[in-house]
Every structure is written in structure tokens, then in C-alpha cells.
């Protein structure tokens, strides 16, 4: 899959799992407690704002999980100009409004590579908090399988848990997250984006290449690992029907859905 922004053709575009309802199918949503990952090659260019994110079924005003964003303008003149932003926006029960960037400055990760040069895996995982699984969650962001930052709703009492309690009360635990992939050219300067012509007046085509999007849920059943074939040795991968290999703890395994 390749989503491309062409200046003469259009300025922005998006793919959304919930939009399957426009083609004769039920809108597609994914479980509240799940791990969502995307492997993609995403351009790091001034004025280009592309990225995958998750929206709560009741709207982004309840919860938005930004799996990847690049704000090139914001960091271009800093000591670490190349950074990944993985922001968390959750309804704030104290103010009655959407809480922006509730995971604070820790949402930024310094990159030592060009994300537009090769594929990397960006992800978010939402786990029930074992202390209070019906009211609270632990949200972890990931880059290439490693956790970049973690947010625990219980640390703020019941201030940021509407996305959990609402889904459970309305029976939507299995159908909570809409997965969207946005391609966009330009954004407000105050948002740290700017416009590409401010740096490159000749920029015309920008592509974000997506290898895959995968969603996993947990199960305590230990998987049966298939025998590794003699050939091809280097290209061998576990079947999607078996299990995603990473393990969260000793007795919980991620299974693809």
C-alpha cells in the first residue's frame, strides 16, 4: 500500500477502518485491549504531516492515540532535529474537554535514522491495569518493538478513563478503535508543521509506503511454534495463524486477529 500526496492533485487524504461501512460492510473497529502496529516508510520532510493513528468509536474527542507523527518544523533547529512524536489525547473528566498530549514531553523520541529511507514499525498497545481492569488501562507506545513511553490512567485517578468505562458500559470492548492512516501536506505553523514550499518550492510528490498493519490481542495459551523449515532459512516467518513472537510477560502471548 502506498498513500501519496500530489500537490496538483490533492492536499490531503486518509484511510480509515471504520469507512468500510461505505462499501456495504460493517464499519471495522478493533478491541479496546490490543496491540496495533504498522510497518511503514514515512517521509521526514518539512511541511509533510503523514501518520497512523487510532480514534475511539465515539470520536477523537473521547480518545485519540497518535501512533506516529513528525513535526519537522518544531525541532529543525534543535540539537536533535529528528524526532518521533507519539501523542495521547484523552477526554479529561475534570475539565469536560479533550486533554491534549496528556503523556507529556515523554511522547517525543529522538531518532538516529531517517524514517523515510527504510521501513520501521510503529505501535501502540492498550492493556487493562491489573489493579482495576474495568476502569483503568496502561498505554504503551512502541518503535521497532521497543517501548518508548508508557501512560497509566490510574496515576490520575478517574480523570482520563472515559474511553475505557464508556466502551465497557456500551459493550464495545471488542469494537473500540478505528485505525486511520493520514497523508497530508501542510499544517499550521503553531502546530510545528508549516508548509513545504517554505523550504522546497519544487516539491511535488511525497509518498508514505505501508508494508502492513497488524492487530494483536492477548491469550494465556502458550502457542505451538511450528518447526523451522530447511529453506528458506533467512526468510522464515511464523504463520499469522499461530502467534506474533513477542511476549509481554511469561504467560501472556500476542495473537493476531
Annotate the PLM regions:
Residues 238-257:
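Extracellular/luminal Pro/Thr/Ser-rich low-complexity repeat and linker "mucin-like" segments
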Residues 1-238:
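GH16 jelly-roll
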Amino acid at each position: 500500500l502506498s498513500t501519496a500526496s500530489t500537490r496538483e492533485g490533492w492536499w490531503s487524504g486518509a484511510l480509515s477502518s471504520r469507512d468500510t461501512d461505505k462499501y456495504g460492510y460493517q464499519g471495522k473497529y478493533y478491541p479496546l485491549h490490543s496491540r496495533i502496529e504498522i510497518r511503514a516508510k514515512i517521509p521526514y520532510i518539512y511541511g509533510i504531516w503523514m501518520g497512523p493513528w487510532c480514534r475511539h468509536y465515539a470520536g477523537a474527542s473521547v480518545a485519540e492515540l497518535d501512533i506516529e507523527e513528525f513535526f519537522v518544523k518544531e525541532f529543525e533547529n534543535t540539537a536533535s532535529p529528528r524526532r518521533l512524536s507519539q501523542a495521547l489525547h484523552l477526554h479529561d473528566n475534570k475539565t469536560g474537554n479533550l486533554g491534549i498530549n496528556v503523556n507529556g514531553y515523554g511522547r517525543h523520541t529522538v531518532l538516529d535514522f531517517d524514517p523515510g529511507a527504510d521501513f520501521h514499525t510503529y505501535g501502540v498497545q492498550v492493556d487493562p491495569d491489573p489493579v482495576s481492569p474495568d476502569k483503568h488501562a496502561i498505554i504503551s507506545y512502541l518503535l521497532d518493538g521497543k517501548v518508548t513511553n508508557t501512560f497509566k490512567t490510574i496515576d490520575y485517578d478517574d480523570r482520563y478513563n472515559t474511553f475505557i468505562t464508556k466502551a465497557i458500559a456500551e459493550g464495545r470492548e471488542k469494537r473500540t478503535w478505528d485505525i486511520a492512516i493520514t497523508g497530508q501536506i501542510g499544517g499550521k505553523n503553531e502546530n510545528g508543521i508549516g508548509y513545504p514550499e517554505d523550504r522546497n518550492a519544487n516539491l511535488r510528490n511525497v509518498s508514505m509506503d505501508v508494508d502492513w498493519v497488524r492487530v494483536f490481542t492477548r491469550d494465556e495459551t502458550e502457542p505451538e511454534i511450528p518447526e523451522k523449515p530447511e529453506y528458506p532459512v533467512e526468510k522464515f516467518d511464523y504463520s499469522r495463524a499461530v502467534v506474533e513472537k513477542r511476549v509481554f510477560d511469561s504467560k501472556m502471548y500476542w495473537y493476531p486477529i
